[in-house]
């Protein structure tokens, strides 16, 4: 249940300024969706008894959230580098 509640909070983000929200989360969302695909693959391979449906879902959620966080962290680092380069 904890994973599910975490996922729903990710899939329903708080209302923000649309343009800034879409630009800032675009890369993290795409990375998250890539991780969803990987999670499905690994869930199928590594699941007990050939990978049950529940294991696939858990794999997708865990990898999706992980990818979402990784994308956000990467974006923050990239933004920091951009600001650091703008020196007079």
UniProtKB/Swiss-Prot annotation:
One of its GO terms (cellular component) is protein folding chaperone complex. Keywords: Chaperone, Ubl conjugation. Residues 40-88 are annotated as: Pseudo-amyloid region. Residues 1-30 are annotated as: Disordered. Disulfide bonds: none annotated. Ubiquitinated. Degraded by the proteasome; degradation is stimulated by polyglutamine (polyQ) aggregates. Residues 1-10 have a biased composition (Polar residues). InterPro entries: HssA/B-like_chaperone, HssA/B-related. One of its GO terms (molecular function) is unfolded protein binding. Residues 11-30 have a biased composition (Low complexity). Expansion of polyglutamine (polyQ) tracts, resulting in protein aggregation, is a cause of neurodegenerative diseases in human. D.discoideum, which encodes many proteins with long polyQ tracts, is resistant to polyQ aggregation, thanks to proteins like hssl63/srcp1. Belongs to the hssA/B family. This is serine-rich chaperone protein 1. It comes from Dictyostelium discoideum.
């Amino acid at each position: 249940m904890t994973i599910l509640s975490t996922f729903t909070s990710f899939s329903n983000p708080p209302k923000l300024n649309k343009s800034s929200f879409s630009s800032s989360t675009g890369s993290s969302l795409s990375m998250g969706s890539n991780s969803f695909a990987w999670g499905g693959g690994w869930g199928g391979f590594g699941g007990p008894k050939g990978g049950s449906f529940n294991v696939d879902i858990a794999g997708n959620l865990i990898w999706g959230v992980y990818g979402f966080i990784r994308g956000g962290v990467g974006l923050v680092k990239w933004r920091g580098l951009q600001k650091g380069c703008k020196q007079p």
